[in-house]
Amino acid sequence: MNINAAPQILGRSSQDITPGYMSGFGNSFETEALPGALPVGRNSPQRCAYGLYAEQLSGSPFTAPRGANERSWLYRIRPSVKHSGRFAKTDMGLWRSAPCFEHDLPIAQLRWDPPPMPQEALTFLQGVRTMTTAGDVNTQAGMATHLYLITQSMVDQHFYNADGEMMFVPQQGSLRLVTEFGIITIEPAEIAVIPRGVKFRVELVDGPARGYLCENYGGAFTLPERGPIGANCLANSRDFLTPVAAYEDKDTPTELYVKWGGSLYVTKLPHSPIDVVAWHGNYAPYKYDLRTYSPVGAIGFDHPDPSIFTVLTSPSETPGTANIDFVIFPERWMVADNTFRPPWYHMNIMSEFMGLIYGVYDAKPQGFVPGGASLHNMMLPHGPDREAFDHASNGELKPVKLTGTMAFMFETRYPQRVTEYAASSGLLQDDYADCWNGLEKRFDPNRP
């Protein structure tokens, strides 16, 4: 199924192109911006149409099992060897990679206020602020969580990440991601995933933008198994959208930045690298609207585990143990009878970084605000504050619909280490643990 998937008309700027999409998750897609640009029945003909070059981009080893084998064939104006000159190492700003040991902050439950929108001009690369790192970028295991603050579009600048795939979670303002596979636009309550090695630039759509970014060093995000849930609900494949081909034939000086091995490098090009006229394969960027997620839950009693809200998972080598789970807490009905309905008190082998896109999170009605974040690291207790506990313990148990809310969680098997920015930026709430002070002793051996 194609959505606005007509061939894209050549423009000197991506602003001349209207995004179009193909639906499905992990499909073998094919798309061309000029008729006949895709070869038929073969991948690398002796001579490609329109004088294009054939190039394969592999996201997995050649010998990976068929179900996990990811690659795309790109038909482009110039091969990527023409997109790399002499690289020079450049400043990473506030972007950090694991392992990162910058701060001796004692272990604790942590929560941050949202960062204010800066007044100075910041492109995407300048606006990334790393909050936590986990695992090791050099062993392709773990992740990093970042905030981004963007006040200026990237102009004649492009980027790709060799260290991991990147999930954008907008909280304020829309983004236009101009990738070599096509163009993706996202707004709050949508996400986009850019695979490692894919070149792109970030443009603003309607003013400054703020949001969250997950950098996945491990296995690519995929849909979780549904098990006894069956064939439907949760995130459905048809709601994921991959862009149709769109290209620039633009001979103007451009900078290409590459994140590799935890460092940032830059080279200068005389042309835009967004020059893929056609492509086919299953390794490509995509977007997803979180509002299409179909949650399941308890319709009798008890509060189920939060894993039922998993949208995407990055598996590890241990079955059932995720490198990263991306989990959301969307609008839903709460109907469980004789049940404490908010998330229960918990100590967990996994480490949880949470953010709030909009609304109120039911376990923390105060202090956890849109654009903010919290971190509950492995084996550190957490749960509802006094206000949430009292309300849930004494309220009438009639069906209640949680509306106007969208929280999310990046959960990993690795401990998440806080960066210097996260510890010292002034956003850290030093009174977060006080939210549990009001939980008094209620035990009475004479009152069952």
From Swiss-Prot:
Q: Which InterPro entries match?
A: HgmA_C (IPR046451), HgmA_N (IPR046452), Homogentis_dOase (IPR005708), Homogentis_dOase_bac (IPR022950), RmlC-like_jellyroll (IPR014710), RmlC_Cupin_sf (IPR011051)
GO terms assigned for molecular function: homogentisate 1,2-dioxygenase activity; iron ion binding
Q: Which Pfam families match?
A: HgmA_C (PF04209), HgmA_N (PF20510)
Binding locations of homogentisate = Y361, H382
GO BP terms, alphabetized: L-phenylalanine catabolic process; tyrosine catabolic process
Query: Which pathway, per its entry?
Result: Amino-acid degradation; L-phenylalanine degradation; acetoacetate and fumarate from L-phenylalanine: step 4/6
Enumerate the residues binding Fe cation: H346, E352, H382
Recite the UniProt keywords alphabetically. Answer: Dioxygenase, Iron, Metal-binding, Oxidoreductase, Phenylalanine catabolism, Tyrosine catabolism
Q: Which residues form the active site?
A: H303
Provide the top EC class.
oxidoreductase
Report the GO terms under cellular component.
cytoplasm
Q: Which cofactor does it need?
A: Fe cation
State the source organism's domain of life.
Bacteria
Q: Which reaction does it catalyse?
A: homogentisate + O2 = 4-maleylacetoacetate + H(+)
User: E.C. number, please?
Assistant: 1.13.11.5
Binding partners and assembly: Hexamer; dimer of trimers.
Functionally, this protein is described as follows:
Involved in the catabolism of homogentisate (2,5-dihydroxyphenylacetate or 2,5-OH-PhAc), a central intermediate in the degradation of phenylalanine and tyrosine. Catalyzes the oxidative ring cleavage of the aromatic ring of homogentisate to yield maleylacetoacetate.
Membership in a protein family? Belongs to the homogentisate dioxygenase family.
Q: Which NCBIfam families match?
A: hmgA
Classification via PANTHER family? HOMOGENTISATE 1,2-DIOXYGENASE (PTHR11056:SF0)
Q: What is this protein called?
A: Homogentisate 1,2-dioxygenase
**Which organism was this protein described from?**
Rhodopseudomonas palustris (strain ATCC BAA-98 / CGA009)
Q: What phylogenetic lineage does the species belong to?
A: Bacteria, Pseudomonadati, Pseudomonadota, Alphaproteobacteria, Hyphomicrobiales
